Swiss-Prot record:
Monomer. Signal peptide: none annotated. This is Phosphoglycerate kinase. It catalyses: (2R)-3-phosphoglycerate + ATP = (2R)-3-phospho-glyceroyl phosphate + ADP. GO terms for cellular component: cytosol. Substrate binds at residues 21-23, 36, 59-62, 113, 146. ATP binds at residues 197, 314, 340-343. Keywords: ATP-binding, Cytoplasm, Glycolysis, Kinase, Nucleotide-binding, Transferase. The gene is pgk. Pathway: Carbohydrate degradation; glycolysis; pyruvate from D-glyceraldehyde 3-phosphate: step 2/5.
Length: 386
């Protein structure tokens, strides 16, 4: 994968437009989770150090296109950036007809989704973005799977289009895990439905040595192996699909599980052997014996890709499986990459973030890359680098 990188460019005196993913949760005008903003700071700081006039843009939420809405304004993000950078970061509402930014200055453009044509990737809007800058930097891996005006269109028309450090690091880490992984490779894919992760499971079954499944996905694989899953969430129509995947790659199944009679925070947890699941049981986590076996697998792996918690970890009595696996990944010498919103929440909860080689900032983009799909915003950077 060959793309031009911002780190290789001379930006002195240049007008640089950086597309970041600053789509963060905001409540009552205050940023509630700053992870994406923190991830973008090194890129913004580097552009300033290189002497660029810096313009930053992003979307936030899903406003009605072409209409301003206060709840989707980037004002709280501008305030946060001002504090984080130790300088005022003005929020510009009107910018499509040109802005005055001096080298060493940084401004934030208001939500790109307030602009008509953003989601449809309209050429006219993309050309207006491109006219604002000498160099366009795509740094938002989290939106790289969407062909929109500020992620894809602008890269077609800008004088120079390159990948920012955050995007470049994501592509490098994912490439390392998927293109030429050190063996043995283990993948953990968990979630409520096989149907939503079918492409991920199929793709990983061709690259990994061990495919650990969890959540509702594991229940479908258990049913495929002839076990009773009681009232657990599973997809009867995908049992044959699960069998086909299990025929291609080693899918270790739980030997014990944690069950409850109801899906509730107050539900009583009971550990049962896999062949003792009753008709009115719901499987809500892997059991301690299974967690220990899977942990050993992970500790002996050299590449680990993790997407999804293996139990309902939001309820502590069903969180042990995810906790044990998270700690095993952290203790493993493997190159480990983790992605997906629930996975990041689990990493935070169990405090293992420092020990995971790479934590992806992209949810949908992470999954599409793992599926082997082309990310439009990356493809256009490759075209421009030719």
């Amino acid at each position: 994968m060959t793309v031009l990188k911002m780190t290789d460019l001379d930006l002195k005196g240049k007008r640089v437009l950086i597309r970041e993913d600053l789509n963060v949760p905001v409540k009552d005008g205050v940023v509630k989770s700053d992870a994406r903003i923190l991830a973008s700071l090194p890129t913004i700081k580097l552009a300033l150090e290189k002497g660029a006039a810096v313009m930053v843009c992003s979307h936030l939420g899903r406003p009605t296109e072409g209409e301003y809405s206060e709840e989707n304004s980037l004002k709280p993000v501008a305030d946060y950036l001002s504090g984080a950078l130790g300088r005022e970061v003005p929020l510009l509402g009107e910018y499509l007809d040109g802005v005055k930014v001096e080298p060493g200055q940084v401004v934030l453009f208001e939500n790109v989704r307030f602009n008509k044509g953003e989601k449809k990737n309209a050429d006219e809007l993309a050309q207006r973005y491109a006219a604002l800058c000498d160099v366009f930097v795509m740094d938002a891996f989290g939106t790289a799977h969407r062909a929109e005006g500020s992620t894809h269109g602008v890269a077609r028309f800008a004088k120079v289009a390159c990948a920012g450090p955050l995007l470049a690091a994501e592509l490098e880490a994912l490439g390392k895990a998927l293109d030429n992984p050190q063996r043995p490779m283990a993948a953990i894919v968990a979630g409520s439905k096989v149907s939503t992760k079918l492409d991920v499971l199929n793709s990983l079954s061709q690259v990994c040595d061990q495919l650990i499944v969890g959540g509702g996905i594991a229940n479908t694989f258990l049913a495929a192996a002839g076990y009773k899953v009681g009232k657990s969430l599973y997809e009867a129509d995908l049992v044959d699909t699960a069998k086909a995947i299990a025929a291609k790659v080693s899918v270790p199944l739980p030997v014990d599980v944690v069950v409850a009679k109801a899906f509730a925070e107050s539900a009583e947890a009971t550990v049962k052997a896999i062949d003792e699941v009753a008709d009115d049981d719901m499987i809500l986590d892997i059991g301690p014996q299974t967690a220990a076996q899977f942990a050993e697998l992970l500790k002996s792996s050299r590449t680990i890709l993790w997407n999804g918690p293996v139990g309902v970890f939001e309820f502590d009595q069903f969180g042990n499986g995810t906790k044990v696996l998270a700690e095993a990944i952290a203790a493993s010498p493997a190159f480990s990459i983790a992605g997906g919103g629930d996975t990041l929440a689990a990493i935070d909860k169990y405090g293992v973030g420092e020990k995971i080689s790479y934590i992806s900032t992209g949810g949908g983009a992470f999954l599409e890359f793992v599926e082997g799909k082309v990310l439009p915003a990356v493809a256009v950077l490759e075209e421009r680098a030719r």
